[in-house]
From Swiss-Prot:
It is found in: Cell membrane. Residues 162-283 form the GGDEF domain. It comes from Bacillus subtilis (strain 168). GO terms for cellular component: plasma membrane. SUPFAM superfamilies: Nucleotide cyclase. This is Uncharacterized membrane protein YdaK. The keyword Transmembrane helix applies. It is a multi-pass membrane protein.
Length: 283
């Protein structure tokens, strides 16, 4: 957050410098007649290119403008025709060239600092999201917390020889349900699912919502032989759901579970094994 504040100060300073320099340049150019408006239009174009696309584009436009104007000035002087006196034209071209280079640099820095602020904001939002450990709908922990708890459970199993099973429920037709009934009804559905799961497993079992359509449960001190009874109970609790309008819909899930094994060392390995060896039983 300290870095972002420093970048904000830099952005304010560059904007202030740009406004001050542009004001002085406009005052200087206002003394010109017909060419003054054209000079200002091109100058604003260079500044816009720098702010929107970065310093490289602004410098490229500046070099092209200076090259074209220098060529035209030489051409008109050679042809005995001049838009304005040679000495005045050269002075104007030099001043304008310096101003364009300055504006290119300042507008380019504004572009770079703004881009960095956007990246910092994106990172900050991602960090905040990762620190919000509890899903607002179900009250279950999120994916980051799930990995942390699973790692701790693996360590306890290695140290004390405990057994546990990780159970994953993947709801069928989640996207279709949300599209048909809306986000409010979907939140209500998962509030119901969360309540039913709480009544079906022990309080000491750890519940997670790693993604919108998935529920994960760490069944502590549970051998694999007990899983058929657990699945039967869950099937009974999650068989149907009553919509807010009073109608009932059937719920089905893909189910996979994996008991702890000695060859699994990390939570990532455990979850990868769970996905690869998914036993697709339909509740």
């Amino acid at each position: 957050m300290k870095i972002s504040f420093s970048e904000s100060q830099k952005l304010f300073a560059y904007f202030s410098g740009l406004i001050a320099a542009l004001s002085l340049f406009i005052y200087y150019v206002s003394a010109q007649q017909s060419e003054g408006a054209l000079i200002l239009c091109i100058t604003f174009g260079v500044i816009a290119a720098g702010i929107w696309f970065g310093p490289i584009y602004a410098l490229a436009v500046t070099l092209i403008v200076l090259f074209v104007l220098g060529t035209l000035m030489m051409f008109f002087q050679t042809g005995q025709t001049s838009l304005f006196p040679a000495e005045e034209g050269l002075r104007m071209l030099v001043v304008w060239g310096i101003a364009l280079l300055l504006f290119s640099f300042i507008s380019g820095r504004i572009h770079d600092i703004t881009a960095e602020l956007r990246r910092s904001m994106t990172r900050l939002q991602s960090e905040i999201k990762s620190y919000v450990a509890v899903d607002r709908v179900t009250g279950f922990d999120n994916k980051q917390r799930m990995k942390l708890e699973l790692s701790e459970e693996i360590k306890r199993a290695e140290r004390y020889g405990n057994s546990f099973v990780f159970l994953l429920l993947h709801m069928h037709y989640f996207k279709e349900f949300k599209s048909l009934y809306g986000e409010k009804e979907t939140d209500r559905l998962f509030q119901y699912v969360g309540q039913q799961i709480r009544t079906s497993v022990r309080e000491t079992d750890k519940k997670f919502r790693p993604s919108d359509e998935r529920i994960g449960i760490v069944l502590t001190h549970t051998p694999a032989e007990h899983m058929p009874a657990v699945l039967t109970k869950l099937k009974k609790q999650l068989d149907t759901y009553q919509l807010e309008n009073g109608k009932y819909v059937s719920l089905t899930f893909h189910v996979c579970y994996l008991p702890y094994r000695n060859d699994i060392q990390t939570a990532d390995q455990f979850l990868e094994e769970l996905e690869n060896e998914m036993m697709m039983n339909e509740l």
